[in-house]
């Protein structure tokens, strides 16, 4: 049997297609990291949204609960003090359903907000391969970190899914089109 030659135009289409994939592969990481940097405020919002819902970056309830918090052990009646604090917190910061899909926190679950100083201090800092989220500018953030762990700054699965669906996938679609694919 003889060899069948592919028409030149098919070869050219295939070559252009391969070049498009190479271009996409080369530019994808840089573009997605740049997008993270451009949306750093959104990641700060994700962290505060998680905290307001009473969960950390692993989507676990913040602990200690008010009824277990060592802070209230310094009061003459720790239960009465924690109950009064819970009641006050429910009045000034009532639980609400999250746009990320978290249920409202219960009355005994902290949300780490009183005046908003700590939430305002949550800062996403661009780094080479993404973002680093920290607290900057409040004197008591180290106390909060000791009590609740640095996991409070992590981005949970619900926030990641939201970001991928609403930001990353549209960017990838745009990149694919720009590469002629």
What do these predicted regions represent?
Residues 2-181:
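Short, Lys/Arg-rich flexible segments
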